[in-house]
Swiss-Prot record:
Subcellular localization(s) per the UniProt record: Nucleus
Purpose of the protein: Necessary for the splicing of pre-mRNA. The SF1-U2AF59-U2AF23 complex has a role in the recognition of the branch site (5'-UACUAAC-3'), the pyrimidine tract and the 3'-splice site at the 3'-end of introns.
Annotated RRM domain residues: 44-141
Keyword set includes Zinc-finger: yes
Pfam families the record matches: RRM_1 (PF00076), zf-CCCH (PF00642)
GO biological process: mRNA 3'-splice site recognition; mRNA cis splicing, via spliceosome; mRNA splicing, via spliceosome
Gene3D superfamilies xrefs: 3.30.70.330
SMART domains registered for this protein in UniProt: RRM_1, ZnF_C3H1
Protein name: Splicing factor U2AF 23 kDa subunit
Record has Oxidoreductase as a keyword: no
Predominant cellular place of this UniProt entry's protein: nucleus
Cited InterPro entries: Nucleotide-bd_a/b_plait_sf, RBD_domain_sf, RRM_dom, RRM_dom_euk, U2AF_small, Znf_CCCH
Length: 216
């Protein structure tokens, strides 16, 4: 019985726990959902809900060219990536372009380590971004391939922005490459600096002991 429950946990067969919350980290029913939304105590992934404001959804009526929209999003994505990377190595950053209340503007960040995610949560909830308070929570999402709408990837989604799966908004490929490379170099530099600060104590002890033996 226990193994069966474990095998269906978070799936559509699970009548107790919400499969959408488990896969997406958000559910259109919110607190009114008939199934449980089990918030994780530990996770590599954090969610900052409603953080991205797409200019085309703003009520000011201003029109933008596609180039302007792309440049604005690249600036936002770079800002997010650089800031989140201060807490630890970022493996994936996903920004939702959905318009449904539970997904609109959601920013998901998966770190390499759970400790980095927790550090981010502890700090971000006392900060502001673009004149608005930041809200951050641990998310159960670990596999964005399951969370993202596959039809949207091929421009075939019939539900548009109201889809209940993530419509991930992509930065320019060059920007993403630059950010990943910059993070890799930064981590390598930090690792090299740490090695300089902390000499291998075991190696030092071995040399001392050998020297002592020779003297004897």
């Amino acid at each position: 019985m226990a193994s069966h429950l474990a095998s269906i946990y978070g799936t559509e067969q699970d009548k107790v726990n919400c499969s959408f919350y488990y896969k997406i980290g958000a559910c259109r029913h919110g607190e009114r959902c008939s199934r449980k939304h089990v918030k994780p105590n530990f996770s590599q992934t954090i969610l900052c809900p409603n953080m991205y404001k797409n200019p085309i959804h703003e009520p000011n009526g201003k029109k933008f060219t596609q180039r302007e929209l792309a440049e604005q999003f690249d600036a936002f994505y770079e800002d997010m990536f650089c800031e989140f990377s201060k807490y630890g190595e970022v493996e994936q950053l996903v920004v939702c372009d959905n318009v449904g209340d539970h997904l609109v503007g959601n920013v998901y960040v998966r770190f390499k380590y759970e400790e980095s995610a927790q550090n981010a949560i502890d700090d971000l909830n006392s900060r502001w971004y673009s004149q608005r308070p930041v809200y951050a929570e641990l998310s159960p999402v670990t596999d964005f391939r399951e969370a993202c709408c596959r039809q949207h990837e091929t421009s075939e989604c019939q539900r548009g922005g109201l889809c209940n799966f993530m419509h991930a908004k992509k930065p320019s490929p060059q920007l993403l490459r630059d950010l990943v490379l910059a993070q890799r170099k930064y981590l390598a530099l930090n690792a090299a600096e740490e090695m300089k600060k902390e000499p291998n104590s075991d190696s030092t002890n071995r040399w001392v002991s050998v020297t002592a033996e020779r003297k004897n």
